A protein has these predicted regions:
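Conserved histidines in hydrophobic membrane contexts and catalytic metal-binding motifs
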Residues: 1-353
């Protein structure tokens, strides 16, 4: 079991460290973006105005970017954050998503239109999601997440009496310290790594089990939905069609067969589910109600999958975010201590011969 733990760790340590380290950075991506782009991520302090109407804001965006179409609109659960508007250029073919930040209280566009993978956080996100290798990177990271389970389980077997001296950290010799710290960090970080690895493996590999997505012939333009449909009216109707529903993301049609879908949450829903767990869908031409998916009434499978988002990000509260941040750094520390112990053990065996 020691050999299984060691050699799998050596094979996958680099992608695992990259994925987890970048994940730690992304836990605080809004804070980092606020430093890199001051005055963009959050609305002005002391703003006691009411949000402007969605239709008014949509008109402003369309006037500012006449050759683009809004395909996504994120309204953060934190009212102090600006809205994030996703746009695609008009025309057919595969296109790159771009976004702007919008102060929904003043109507001010707070940033330039930038590609989704631009800037420091954009590059970190791409590294985290696919190692900058697109689908090949997704597969590699998916396999890494699966083998992270094996590494963790085999580690528990190797240190099966870990509970006896779990809190002991000896500094007498480097090898002793590395062994104690390896066990200590591994045991305490494993539950979070389990949750992150499970959700990460699902997101990275599920495209392999879904029909191919070809959006090359879909034409982006003003005709993707009837512009006479009021977004404000849909948001109000959604709160009626699913009592208590709060909209946090509006998805507009950007592929064949898509309609207008509002993602959100209900105040009484379980803390395990995110602010995007429930959906209400309306026809893109008539605004007639098509579907209501209340996560509290969903199947056990859908409920389980819905917990992945918060389990992956750890954004239950400020304390859990910090714990997830620390656990994201754990594979780096475990790799350093593990490689040191492996070299030490190999040298000892060589001298013994």
């Amino acid at each position: 079991m020691y050999k299984i733990h060691t050699y799998i760790s050596l094979i996958f340590c680099i992608p695992l460290v990259i994925a987890c380290f970048t994940g730690s950075v992304l836990v605080y991506k809004d804070k980092i973006n606020n430093i890199l782009m001051p005055g963009v991520i959050y609305v002005a302090d002391g703003n006691d105005e009411k949000r402007l109407k969605f239709d008014e804001l949509r008109e402003k965006i369309e006037k500012e970017y006449p050759h683009h179409e809004i395909v996504g609109w994120n309204i953060d659960v934190d009212p102090q954050k600006t809205d994030k508007i996703w746009l695609l250029p008009h025309g057919a073919g595969e296109k790159e998503w771009a976004c702007v930040y919008l102060d929904a209280f003043s109507g001010e566009i707070k940033s330039d239109l930038v590609p989704h993978d631009s800037g420091f956080i954009g590059v970190i996100t791409e590294l985290h999601e696919n190692l900058l290798l697109e689908k090949s990177g997704q597969i590699l990271l998916g396999l890494t997440a699966i083998f992270a389970f094996i590494i963790s389980i085999s580690g528990f077997i190797v240190y099966r009496n870990f509970w006896a001296n779990l809190l002991r950290l000896r500094f007498s010799r480097m090898a002793t310290f590395m062994s104690d710290s390896h066990k200590f960090i591994g045991v305490f970080s494993t539950p979070v790594i389990f949750a992150v690895a499970l959700s990460g493996a699902w997101w990275e590999l599920r495209f392999m089990f879904m029909p191919p997505f070809d959006n090359s012939k879909f034409v982006i333009g003003p005709q993707i939905y009837d512009k006479n449909i009021s977004i404000d009216a849909l948001v109000q109707r959604a709160a009626s069609d699913m009592p208590g529903f709060e909209t946090h993301y509006v998805s507009f049609p950007f592929f064949d067969g898509a309609n207008i879908t509002l993602y959100g949450q209900k105040p009484q829903q379980s803390f395990l589910h995110s602010q995007y767990s429930s959906t209400v869908t309306y026809d893109k031409n008539s605004a007639n109600l098509i579907d209501v998916k209340d996560i509290e009434l969903a199947s056990k499978t859908d409920k389980f999958l819905s917990t992945f988002r918060r389990a992956h990000y750890g954004d239950y509260n400020a304390a859990t975010k910090f714990i997830w941040f620390l656990c994201g750094l754990a594979p780096l520390a475990l790799s350093v201590s593990g490689i040191y112990l492996w070299i030490k053990r190999s040298n000892f065996k060589r001298r013994k011969r």
